[in-house]
Amino acid sequence: AKGKNTKKFAAVVDEEGGAVTAXYXF
């Protein structure tokens, strides 16, 4: 569950809440 999926998900979350991206910046 690490890699492209995580990066893509983080990008989507970044648009809604940049702070949340930090938690998904694996």
Curated annotation (Swiss-Prot):
It is a single-pass membrane protein. The keyword Transmembrane applies. Keywords: Membrane, Mitochondrion, Mitochondrion outer membrane, Protein transport, Transmembrane, Transport. GO terms for cellular component: mitochondrial outer membrane. One of its GO terms (biological process) is protein transport. It is found in: Mitochondrion outer membrane. It comes from the Eukaryota. Forms part of the preprotein translocase complex of the outer mitochondrial membrane (TOM complex). Belongs to the Tom7 family. Seems to act as a modulator of the dynamics of the mitochondrial protein transport machinery. Seems to promote the dissociation of subunits of the outer membrane translocase. This is Mitochondrial import receptor subunit TOM7-2. It comes from Solanum tuberosum. The gene is TOM7-2.
